[in-house]
Each structure stands twice: as C-alpha cells, then as structure tokens.
C-alpha cells in the first residue's frame, strides 16, 4: 500500500524522524487557516500517489496565508498524470542549504534489503543513477544486524554527504530504518533530505510503501486506506478476503489461483479480438476454496460492475474438488437470485471434474453454459459479452 506524503510524514513523526510541521486539508480556506496557524511561509503540496507534482504545478510556495488560499484553489482538482488532487498538505517552508537522497527498499532480485544514498537530492533518483552513478551509493543491509548509528554513518559517507553533517544524517537514517522495519515497509524514501543553513537535517518529502501481507501486525494501518479513492468493488472484495482488481473490459473473470486467473485474462483478451475488441473486466482470485459463500461473494462483486456483460468462471479442482466448486456455483446463484442476471460460462477441470460437470448439467440453470476447454470458454464468454 502506497501512502500519501502526509501519511508518510505521520510515520516520520511516530519514529522521531525530523520534518517540518504541517497539516492536511481538502479546502482552500483550510489551507489559509493552517498557514495562519503556522505563522511562517508554507509549501502547499498536492497529495497524490505519483511523482512529478512540482513540474505539474502541484507544489507551490506561499509567503502569506492569502497566497496559500490562492494556490490551494488552483491545485485542488488539478489532474496530475491521471490523479485528481483532492487533498493538500500545508507545511512550513524550510531554508535549504543542500539536498540529499536516502531510501531503504526491498531488493527482490538479490533477496536482501538495500539502502540508497546520494548527495544529489531533489531530482529524480533514476536520473542520478543514469547520469551520475558514482554519486549514488547502493548499500546492502543485513536484516539480522540492522542499521545502527555506525552503519548509518557509513551509508551517508558512501553517499558522499559532507563530513560536517554525517553524524546528524546518521541519526535520521537510523530512525528511517527503524520505521522501515517497525512498520513492515517495502520502501521508505526521502527526497529531498535537506541540510538547513544551521546544519539541521530534515525530511522535507516522504514516500512510504507498506507490505499489505503484514497488515495483521498493524491494525492501525487501516487508517491509511483512502476509501474514497478506492474502487467500491475492490473494497467489497477486500471485505470477503478476495483478490480483485477492476479493469476496463466486459467479461467478468473468476478463477482460483493467481496464475490461472492471469492466463484467463490473456485468453479472454485474445478471444475478444474477434468479437469487437471485448476485454477482461477484472482480475478476481477466489483462492483455494470455492464454497457457495465464496462463489456468491465473487459473483456479487463481479456483477456489481455495470460494464460486465458476461462472466467466465474458470476453476481447476485441486484440494477443492470440482464437484464442490459446482455445488458452490449452484448455491451461489440461489443466494444471489435476481442479482445474478448475466450469462455465466463455466469451465471446470481437475479433481472430480466429471461429477462437477454432472452437477451443473443437472441444475440446468438458464444462465450457465458449461464449456470443456479454456479456449472455447473464453471465446463463448467474449461472444456473449459482444452480443
């Protein structure tokens, strides 16, 4: 889960990472009030989960509360690379002597953690890596040893930070590591990490990505979910522990196992090319179980998308046998009743497939078409969606 900047800075405060005071608002009047409360020039910053805010006009300096009001009026509603600005962070402006870069991330390729540090902050780190690779330190981190002050100082030194700020930077870097580990993050990035004229080190911007697989350890992380910006169908799926991602097509997809669902998306997209460009409407993985309740929840989510014209249920029976899946489909249709109003194309294979097919055949539901192969089922679902 990617966090907004103001949420990341909330975690900075929790872990004693020095930053500038500020608050979030969704109105221009609120921006003026916060600027008045701070009593100093402020930065008015669009809160979107995308880079390039400054170049798009989403970050402005305001010398007075009235300036903050004017900038907020201009930024709210701004479209930044497809992200519409609904919230603003109004934070105290800081005098900047130098800008640095620091991040901790999960290095999947090398199966380790990585610290990245550079004296070249305030610009895209990809640009630094491409044009000044010698100025970007990439330091592997042993999770068992962590990052103490000595190692944090070494990271800063390898990033070519000036000698006079190494000790102060080390304190901040070690606290960022504490955040990274303590909050189960996969990314903690500060760009810029600034040096003020009096040699303070401040995190002026922040990017944090949290590992959703660790949510059970962090019940407080639920507050970071931007429910207003999340698709309501995705929220409904999450309530049932279903893995759902809404797409922009017309064929609803339900499968068990991420690999099978991804393959199903491909075959439906291919089949749709000869049926007017029909495409998959979603990714929905119901996991290893396909009980009536799970299937009903999945169908309810998929059919809640007004773009869906047909549904392709593609299940391979493993631990959960095909007869159990078929029974689940029949009972799910009974549970949903009139809400199940789109044609279903069902393909079953695997454990006890013949019994599963018999159950669906005997049920003789008018919306269900049983098809033996995945390619044929994808073609039929695309055909029905294009009708």
UniProtKB/Swiss-Prot annotation:
The EC number(s) attached to this protein equal 6.2.1.5
InterPro entries attached to this UniProt entry: ATP-grasp, ATP-grasp_succ-CoA_synth-type, ATP_grasp_subdomain_1, Succ-CoA_synthase_bsu_CS, SUCC_ACL_C, Succ_CoA_ligase-like_bsu, Succinyl-CoA_synth-like
The cross-references to SUPFAM superfamilies, in alphabetical order and at most eight, read: Glutathione synthetase ATP-binding domain-like (SSF56059), Succinyl-CoA synthetase domains (SSF52210)
Gene Ontology terms, cellular component aspect?
Answer: cytosol; succinate-CoA ligase complex
Q: Name one GO molecular function term.
A: ATP binding
Q: Which cofactor does it need?
A: Mg(2+)
Q: Which PROSITE patterns match?
A: ATP_GRASP (PS50975), SUCCINYL_COA_LIG_3 (PS01217)
Q: Which UniProt keywords apply?
A: ATP-binding, Ligase, Magnesium, Metal-binding, Nucleotide-binding, Tricarboxylic acid cycle
Q: Where does substrate bind?
A: 256, 318-320
Looking up HAMAP family in the UniProt record yields: Succ_CoA_beta (MF_00558)
Q: What family does the Swiss-Prot or TrEMBL record give for this protein?
A: Belongs to the succinate/malate CoA ligase beta subunit family.
What protein does this entry describe? Succinate--CoA ligase [ADP-forming] subunit beta
**What organism is the protein native to?**
Mycobacterium ulcerans (strain Agy99)
Gene that produces this protein: sucC
């Amino acid at each position: 889960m990617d966090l907004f900047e103001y949420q990341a800075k909330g975690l900075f405060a929790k872990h004693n990472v020095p930053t500038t005071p500020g608050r979030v608002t969704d109105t221009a009047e609120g921006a003026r009030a916060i600027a008045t409360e701070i009593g100093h020039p402020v930065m008015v910053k669009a809160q979107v989960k995308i880079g390039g805010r400054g170049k798009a006009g989403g970050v402005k300096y305001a010398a007075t509360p009235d300036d903050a009001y004017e900038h907020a009026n201009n930024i709210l509603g701004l479209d930044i690379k497809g992200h519409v600005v609904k919230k603003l962070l109004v934070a105290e402006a800081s005098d900047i002597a130098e800008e640095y870069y620091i991040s901790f991330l999960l290095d999947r390729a090398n199966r380790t953690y990585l610290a990245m540090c550079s004296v070249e902050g305030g610009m895209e780190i990809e640009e630094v890596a491409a044009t000044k690779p010698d100025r970007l330190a990439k330091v592997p981190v042993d999770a068992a040893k962590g990052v103490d002050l000595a190692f944090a100082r070494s990271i800063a030194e390898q990033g070519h930070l000036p000698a006079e700020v190494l000790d102060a930077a080390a304190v901040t870097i070690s606290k960022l590591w504490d955040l990274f580990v303590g909050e189960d993050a996969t990314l903690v990035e500060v760009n810029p990490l600034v040096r003020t004229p009096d040699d303070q080190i401040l995190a002026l911007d922040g990017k944090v990505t949290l590992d959703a697989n660790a949510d059970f350890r962090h019940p407080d992380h639920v507050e970071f979910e931007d429910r207003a910006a999340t698709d309501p169908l995705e929220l409904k799926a999450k309530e049932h522990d279903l893995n759902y991602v809404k797409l922009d097509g017309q064929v609803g997809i339900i499968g068990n196992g991420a690999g099978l669902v991804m393959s199903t998306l491909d075959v439906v997209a291919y089949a749709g090319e000869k049926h007017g460009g029909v495409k998959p409407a979603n990714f929905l993985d119901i996991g290893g179980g396909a009980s009536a309740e799970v299937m009903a929840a999945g169908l309810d989510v998929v059919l809640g998308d007004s773009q869906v014209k047909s549904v392709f249920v593609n299940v391979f029976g493993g631990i959960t046998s095909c007869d159990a899946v078929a029974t689940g489909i029949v009972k799910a249709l009974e549970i949903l009743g009139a809400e199940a109003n789109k044609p279903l194309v069902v393909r079953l294979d695997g454990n006890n497939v013949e019994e599963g097919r018999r159950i669906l055949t005997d049920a003789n539901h008018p919306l269900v078409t049983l098809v033996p192969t995945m390619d044929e089922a994808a073609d039929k679902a695309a055909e029905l969606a294009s009708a």
